């Protein structure tokens, strides 16, 4: 809700939208940000003047820079550096009215089976930002029946908790374009029965901001029937 901009950092020094300083990325390895005393920027609460260097692993973020109500999130995604500006006074945050949800539906709690892979697999996925490739670390498959229709979803997670990132028939109208649901794994992450409560299906941050880089479902990871349970699409004045 607080995100207000996303700027990919160029190799030639230049500005980023919504935050002071000049910024440049070198060979996808480091970011150099330069500030003057007039920029009124702090790092970890201390005034900054001169050059600040960031070096992150892919997928990492750093949010030590502040300017008034704004924070600069330096992030590395898909081998590229970006700055996302977060503002505690962002309009989306100011007018937030809460996440709409469906009423509790006991029929949305379904039994299923989990079958782990021999070894976890990393598969390429798309994300909420077309410029940012993603990877899903999938550990197995869950099978279940929802409203009379059989479904199979690949899941991520560990020996205690599994997560399915999924599509269903409500997406883009009643719900966000995709959602996720987490549930307990069988003991030790072994093959066995699971209970999936779709009343706990939730939106990713990308449902509330165009500046998200949230993971999308693996190809084909969907349920054909509408799942009218869990979190709904944010209201019209909370853009999806």
Located regions from the model:
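Surface-exposed beta-loop interaction hotspot
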Residues: 68-136
């Amino acid at each position: 809700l607080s995100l207000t901009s996303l700027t990919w950092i160029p190799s030639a020094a230049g500005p980023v939208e919504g935050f002071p300083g000049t910024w440049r990325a070198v060979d996808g390895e480091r970011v150099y940000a330069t500030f003057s005393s007039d920029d009124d920027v702090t790092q970890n609460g201390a005034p900054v003047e001169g050059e600040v260097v960031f070096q992150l692993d892919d997928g990492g973020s750093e949010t030590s820079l502040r300017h008034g109500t704004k924070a600069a999130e330096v992030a590395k995604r898909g081998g590229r550096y970006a700055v996302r500006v977060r503002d505690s006074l962002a309009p989306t945050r100011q007018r937030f009215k809460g996440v709409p949800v469906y009423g509790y539906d006991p029929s949305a709690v379904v039994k299923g089976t989990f079958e782990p892979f021999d070894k976890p697999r990393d598969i390429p996925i798309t994300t909420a930002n077309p410029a940012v490739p993603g990877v899903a670390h999938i550990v197995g498959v869950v099978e279940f029946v929802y409203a009379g229709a059989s479904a199979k979803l690949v899941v991520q997670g560990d020996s205690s908790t599994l997560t399915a990132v999924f599509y269903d028939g409500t997406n883009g109208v009643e719900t966000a374009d995709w959602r996720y649901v987490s549930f307990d794994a069988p003991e030790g992450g072994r093959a066995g029965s699971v209970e999936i409560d779709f009343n706990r299906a939730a939106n990713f941050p990308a449902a509330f901001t165009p500046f998200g880089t949230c993971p999308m479902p693996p190809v084909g990871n969907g349920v054909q029937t509408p799942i009218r349970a869990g979190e709904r699409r944010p209201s019209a004045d909370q853009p999806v």
